[in-house]
Structure formats: structure tokens, C-alpha cells
Design a protein with these regions (language model features):
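N-terminal structured subdomain of primase-like DNA metabolism proteins
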Residues: 1-89
């Protein structure tokens, strides 16, 4: 997920003050800007959650890089796969 953030987001800063309720999960919080939109993401392994989206919204989080790219830049599945492949190069 970090490779994708680096590839698609203009700015990203890790919040080193963030502490998770389950330290063994390895969750990390990032403040990112992508296409002039702000996101506050928690990344835990291959899962992610956008804290700035209403908790009852259906698109608040997901699993994997493709879902993350679709959320960050608002593109469809096929386009997101291409972006992820570019990020992996």
C-alpha cells in the first residue's frame, strides 16, 4: 500500500503520534493529498481506512492497493489495476 501512496499522492506524511488500540496490528496513520483532496488513512497490512469519510459510509475502507487507488483518485477497476502495475515497476 505504501508504494501506491508514493506513486499516486502528491504529499504524504506519516503521523508518528498515532497509537493504535491493537499495537500488534502494526497500524500506521498517514495524512495524504491526492488530486487536491485530503485523506487521513490508517494502513494495517493490506487493509486501509479513511478516517475523514463518515463512519456509516460504505466506501470508508477496503483491502488492497486496487481499492485504495480507486478511493484516492476515483477511477474504475481496470484503470486502478494499471496504476498499481505502474507503481510496482
Amino acid at each position: 500500500l505504501l508504494k501506491v501512496l508514493i506513486h499516486v499522492c502528491h504529499s504524504r506524511n506519516e503521523d508518528h503520534t498515532y497509537t493504535t488500540t491493537a499495537p500488534s496490528s502494526g497500524g500506521r496513520r498517514f495524512h495524504v493529498n491526492c488530486l487536491k483532496r485530503d485523506f487521513r488513512l490508517i494502513l494495517t497490512g493490506e487493509k486501509w481506512l479513511d478516517e475523514l469519510v463518515d463512519r456509516y459510509a460504505g466506501n470508508r475502507g477496503g483491502g488492497g492497493s486496487i481499492d485504495l487507488v480507486m478511493h484516492l483518485i476515483g477511477i474504475n477497476f481496470v484503470q486502478a489495476v494499471r496504476v498499481c502495475l505502474e507503481a510496482a515497476e
